[in-house]
């Protein structure tokens, strides 16, 4: 596991918030592999087109119009050859308050042009075991 790999993956995660908060669905989708997917609150978006559509959709655009900030916590990254996993917490702020606090488990694949997100699972940290398990899985990796 090289420091360069960890930095590149951390940068991908860090790029998510600014891209999604500016409504740039194409930039969000470009973080993912062509066949990458994102599962948030039980909704699964498969492929770049669906991920971009989520950001461009009315629900997300409404959040942006009211004021929103997606803040990614520092990830714990484990690289194994051309794949990697990371876990982190994220906080979504709405104008004046915390709206959601979540656990994230990301997988990554190394491509000819660099690292891309293969998958992201996001679950609310609301006391449910499923969210805690996302964070716990990485320690066993």
Task: Report the location of each language-model feature.
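A solvent-exposed, acidic/Ser-Thr-rich amphipathic alpha-helical stretch
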Residues: 25-90
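Short, cysteine-centered beta-strand-loop-beta hairpins and adjacent loop/turn segments enriched
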Residues: 92-99
